[in-house]
Amino acid sequence: MIEEEVLKIIKPTEEDKKGIEKVLEIIRERLNKLDFEVEGSFRKGTWLRQDTDIDVFVFYPKDVGKEYLERNALNDIINRIKDLDYTLAYAEHPYVIVNINNVEVDIVPALRVESGDKAITAVDRTPFHTKYVTSHLDERGKDEVRLLKRFMKGIGVYGAELKVQGFSGYATELLIIYYGNFRKVLEEASKWKHPIKIELTKPMKIFSEPLIIPDPVDPKRNVTAAVSLKNIATFSIAAKYYLKNPSIEFFFPSKKVEEKVKGDVLILRLNLDEKSSEDIVWGQIKRSVNKIERALKQYGFRVIDVQAWGDTNNITIAVQLESKNIGQYYLNIGPQYYSQTIEDFIQKNDNIWVGEDGRLYSIKERKEYDAETIAKKNIVLKVKYNIESYWLQNTEDQQIMKFLRKTPTWLK
Amino acid sequence: MIEEEVLKIIKPTEEDKKGIEKVLEIIRERLNKLDFEVEGSFRKGTWLRQDTDIDVFVFYPKDVGKEYLERNALNDIINRIKDLDYTLAYAEHPYVIVNINNVEVDIVPALRVESGDKAITAVDRTPFHTKYVTSHLDERGKDEVRLLKRFMKGIGVYGAELKVQGFSGYATELLIIYYGNFRKVLEEASKWKHPIKIELTKPMKIFSEPLIIPDPVDPKRNVTAAVSLKNIATFSIAAKYYLKNPSIEFFFPSKKVEEKVKGDVLILRLNLDEKSSEDIVWGQIKRSVNKIERALKQYGFRVIDVQAWGDTNNITIAVQLESKNIGQYYLNIGPQYYSQTIEDFIQKNDNIWVGEDGRLYSIKERKEYDAETIAKKNIVLKVKYNIESYWLQNTEDQQIMKFLRKTPTWLK
C-alpha cells in the first residue's frame, strides 16, 4: 500500500522525538517561571519527520494588551535566549525564532484568554486549537493527518502563508477529525463543488469563501478562509486522480520535466535588496502578478499564464503570451452614423471609414505595445529590487520547465 | 455656388444631346417595325454629360413568355445589328450592347405588361418608371437629380450593381420628387436613422430593409432594397458634412492620397480567366471578402478591414490585420474542477493547469496561423483565376493608398 510506504518515510521515530525533546529542554530552561506551553504539530503529534518547527507559546494575562507583548514580553524573551542563534520574525505581531541543532523553535508571545472566541490576537486561539485536536485525534488519526499533510505538500496546496494560500495544519487536522481518515477525506474532496461546508460546529457568521470550516473553538471564524479556489480545485482533482490510481508521485513529486517554449515567454528575475517578511513580499508579488496580467490583457495581449515562484529575496515572474507581437495599431469601433457623437469621433480620429453595419471605425495607435515594458511597469514592490528580464529561448531551469509543462506530474 | 459650378460640368449641352440623337437614329432604323422605346436617364432627361448609356427597350406581348425573349427576340435583335460593334450581356436575362461612336446603347428585350405591378421580368417595369418620373419632374427637377447623382457618384454610393450596392438612378429621381430638390434631400438624409421610410405611395408589403422607398408603380417592391447600410450611412454623413462645408470634392474627389502601412496588410491580386457578368463575379467577391474576414477572426486574428476593388477580371482584395503574428499556440479554457468532463479534458489536452477561478486551462496548437493561407482558402470564385499575394511593404498604387487612408477626402 502506497500510504504505508509514505508513512514509513514521514512518521517520526522515537529518536526524532528525542532529538526535539532535547532541544525543547534547552528552551524550557530559558523560559523558566514564565507561563509557557508547547503548541503546534509537535505537541499535537501530527508533525512530519524532518519537516517541522517547534512552536512554544509564552502567555501573558490578557489585560497587559498587545503592545506589552510586542515590547516588554518580546524583550524579556530575547534577553533569555540572546546567546543562542536567533532572529526576529513578524506575523500579526513579532516573535523569536531560535535555531538549535538545526531545529527551528518559534517562541511566540500570546495573551491568555478564557476561550477561543475571546482571542485578542490571532495566536491567542492556538492553545484551544491544540486542546481541540489532541482531544479528538487518536494515534491512528494522527498518522492520517500526516498522510493528508504530505499529500497536500506534494500537490502544492499545503501552507497557510500568502505565497501558497493553501491549507493550514489545523485545517488538515479538522478534515481528518470530520471525515475520519485520509482516504475518506479524499473521497469527499473528489466530490467537492464550492461553496463547500464542513461543520464540526455551527457557524456563527455567514461566510462567503468557497471552503467553509467554522472553527470549533471560535465559530465566527472560517479556518479555511484564506485557501484559494485554485488550491481547493487542485486538491479535489488530485483526490479524484489519486483514488483512481494511487501513486507515490502525489506525495513526493520527483519526475524531472521537460517542455518546449510555447508562445512567447517573458522571464522576470527579481532580486530584493532588503529582507522583508515573506507574507508582505508575497502579498506584493501576488498583486504584481494580477496587475501584470490585467494590464497586458487591457493593452490587447492574449495572456496564456502568469506565475511567480521563489523565496523572499529571489523571485521569478514568468509571463506567457500567445504572441508578443500584437501590432502597433488597433481597430477602434466608433458610433453609428446617426449618433450625435460622430463629429467628435471624426475630429479626433484618423483612418476613418463606415462599416457594413453603419458604424464608424478608425485605426488607432496603441499607447504601449511592448509586453516587457508593460510587465515591468506593473510590478508593485515596496522594497528596492533589481530586475533582469528576457524572452525565453531555451532553458535548463526546472522551475521554468514546470511552468512550461504546467500539467502536474501526478496528473499526467 | 458649388452646385452651379457642378451643373456646368455635368449638364449635357444641346450638342451632347444631338450626338446621342444621331446614334439613336441608327438604332431606330435597325429596330424598324419593332415595338421599341427609349428608356433610362436619357429619355427622362436626368443623364449626366459624357457619362451615360442609352437604354432602348424592345417590347413583346407578355404572352410570348421569358424564354421567347431570351431566344427568338434576342436573335432577331442580334440579326439586325450584327454588323455593328456589339456584345452580349446578362442581367436577369440577356440583352445586347452596341457601341456606336463611343456611345453605349443597351438594347433590352422586355414584355409589354398593363402596369408596373404586373411585371413578369424586372425590366418590364421600366416604361412605367419612365412615365412616373417624366410626369413628376420639371426641368429644374432634372438638374436636381443630376446634382444628386453626381454627389452620390463622388462619394461612391451610386449604382445599383452588386459591386456598389448603391442607389439606382430611379432612386435618386424618387428622392428628388419626394423632397423637392438636391439640398432638401441632403438636409433630410443628414438626419436619417434607419429604418428610413420614404413613401411616395403606401407600401403593399412590410419591408425589412434599412431604407424603404416603395415603388410608386409597384408598391410591393422596395426601390432601395439593395442599398447597403454602409452606403446609406455614408450618404447621410456626407450630406451632413456637405451642408456644413460645401465643396466640389464631394462631387469630384480629386485629391491624391498618401498613407503609411498600419498593421499588416495582405494584398491579393486576382486575375479571372473567363469573362463573366459583373454581378455574378462581384457576388462571389463579396462572399469571399466576408468569408475571409470571418475565417481570420475565427482563427484568432484581429481584423482591421477587408475590402475589394477592381473590375470584372482584375480584382484586388486587401486584408488589414492588427498583426499577422498571432502565435502558434492559444489559451484553451476548460471546465470547472467539479465538472463531469474534466477527465475527458485532461485526457485530450496537454499543458493543463488549474486557474485561480477553479477552471482547468490548457495550451492548444492552432490548426492554422498563417493569415495568407487562410485568406486564399476562403476565396470562393466559381471561375478559374490566378492569384498573386504579398504582404504590403510600400506602394504607389492609389487604390491601395485609399484603402490605407480610409478617410474619404471629402470628410477630412
From Swiss-Prot, chains A, B:
Residues that hold CTP according to the record: 41, 44, 129, 149, 158
UniProt xrefs under InterPro entries: CAA_C, CCA-adding_arc, CCA_tRNA_nucleotrans_2, NT_2-5OAS_ClassI-CCAase, NT_sf, NuclTrfase_I-like_C, Polymerase_NTP_transf_dom, tRNA_NucTransf2
Alphabetical list of Pfam families matching this protein: CAA_C, NTP_transf_2, tRNA_NucTransf2
Catalytic activity of the protein: a tRNA precursor + 2 CTP + ATP = a tRNA with a 3' CCA end + 3 diphosphate; a tRNA with a 3' CCA end + 2 CTP + ATP = a tRNA with a 3' CCACCA end + 3 diphosphate
Domain of life according to the entry: Archaea
Keywords per UniProt: ATP-binding, Magnesium, Metal-binding, Nucleotide-binding, Nucleotidyltransferase, RNA repair, RNA-binding, Transferase, tRNA processing
Entries under CDD domains matching the protein: NT_2-5OAS_ClassI-CCAase
An example Gene Ontology biological process: RNA repair
Binding site for Mg(2+): 53, 55, 106
E.C. numbers: 2.7.7.72
Binding site for ATP: 41, 44, 129, 149, 158
Coiled coil: none
Family named by the database record: Belongs to the tRNA nucleotidyltransferase/poly(A) polymerase family. Archaeal CCA-adding enzyme subfamily.
Quaternary context: Homodimer.
NCBIfam families in the record: cca_archaeal
Matches recorded under PANTHER family: CCA-ADDING ENZYME
Chain's role: Catalyzes the addition and repair of the essential 3'-terminal CCA sequence in tRNAs without using a nucleic acid template. Adds these three nucleotides in the order of C, C, and A to the tRNA nucleotide-73, using CTP and ATP as substrates and producing inorganic pyrophosphate. tRNA 3'-terminal CCA addition is required both for tRNA processing and repair. Also involved in tRNA surveillance by mediating tandem CCA addition to generate a CCACCA at the 3' terminus of unstable tRNAs. While stable tRNAs receive only 3'-terminal CCA, unstable tRNAs are marked with CCACCA and rapidly degraded.
Note in the entry: A single active site specifically recognizes both ATP and CTP and is responsible for their addition.
Protein's name in the database: CCA-adding enzyme
Originating gene: cca
